[in-house]
Amino acid sequence: MSVSAPMKFIEDYGLIGDGQTAALVHRDGSIDWLCWPRFDSDACFAALLGTNSHGCWRLAPVEAGTSSRRYREDTLVLETDFELTTGHVRLIDFMPVEDGAFAVVRIVRGLEGKVRLRSELDLRFDYGSLRPAIEIDRDRAVGFVGPDLVVLHAPGQLSQRGSCIVAEAEVSQGEEIAFCLRYGSSTETPPPQIAANAALQATETYWRNWIGKFAIETRWPEAVRRSLLTLKAMIFRSTGGIIAAPTTSLPEAPASDLNWDYRYCWLRDAAFTTSALIDAGYHDEAKAFRDWLLRAAGGEPDKIRIMYRVDGSRRLEEWIASWLPGFRGTKPVRIGNAAAAQRQLDVYGELLDSVAAAAKVGIAPTELEGILIASVIGHVERIWDQPDHGLWEVRGDPQHYTYSKVSAWAAVDRFVRRADLHHAADETFVEGMVELRNRMHREICEKGVDRQRGTFVAYYGSDEVDPSLLNLPLMGFELCGILGDE
């Protein structure tokens, strides 16, 4: 309970979510990350990137002991067992998937003996910088600041100790208590308590019904099903947008400053996720993303961006939350993402691959989709020979990245092969794209290959390689005679 957030490890967190946002729950019973009401909203629990004083909700036995945890089969319901000298209790954490619920429910069940518990809710809005006003009425506490409001419903009397809303309870074998935290608007009546066990049953049913549609034989069924559930948790149910991750500023490497905000929808990452879901038989999610993309593109598809907010809006200005010390003390903590303004040519190929995969499983293109794709291809024709920041979103000078060029080639190739999209373009345009595809291939084979070593290079004029090049054969790109294919 007393461990400060900088001493924690990311592998000790479990994910719970409701398709609107997600929370990270540590094995010690502390929820250290939660943005409400959306994935890309401000965090009200930011201890993951700082200390407990930056917002968290700790619920655990008062006495020290050991803990173990697991997900309930085929769900995002997380169970943590605490074993102590006095007894054994189980903490069940989940987020109800009911529309408009905006809730975290925590149920404690006594399995053996008698265990004393303490709940300490330390709310901090605006990524740990704003302490709310708190009003307590017996077993209900309300915290609010600006437009945001959070209400805690507890099983007994609540009190305030410093900045924390505290509750203590004793659970014996066979007994059960429930806590419910809900988000609402500070201008409206605080949302009521949720029937915990009914919500638990409905949440389990939701996840099990969804994963129950997966019927493909695999050597690793449990791992695949868990991966699919996690991907599903990254989809913003209200729009169909797919985020890259529910967190910001977890460093790419220990003690590095490569800390980025991934709570947004990258077209590249979303296309990869969509393809995986299609392969697993989940076509509704693919169609929802296609529709999200059409809305995000609007009436000027040639201005399509590499990433968006979950609702399809485009403002992702990057700034630094200077008051947060960072995960395990690794600064800076970035909010927003400046890479949104970068040119990354690879997104167009991945986007067209995703559209092609959707068509193969019967998701028919709409007229608007045809217009979007034709416009995107016209845009690729205008910019494909320019340098970009590449798959790795390098923040230095742009280069002619080989992977980006091949991805741009793939976009044109997929368009040429998709006769069902040609209705949005005249015959001359299609013929021009055939020639462009061939011209792009010739240039890549000339400038993107080290003939002496028999390998592609990371970017034109370089002798470096990078892992993205391993994907070129999967994109259907003929390998310029490197492996004797020509």
Regions picked out by a protein language model, each given a short descriptive name:
Residues M1-E486:
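Acidic, mature catalytic/reactive cores of soluble proteins
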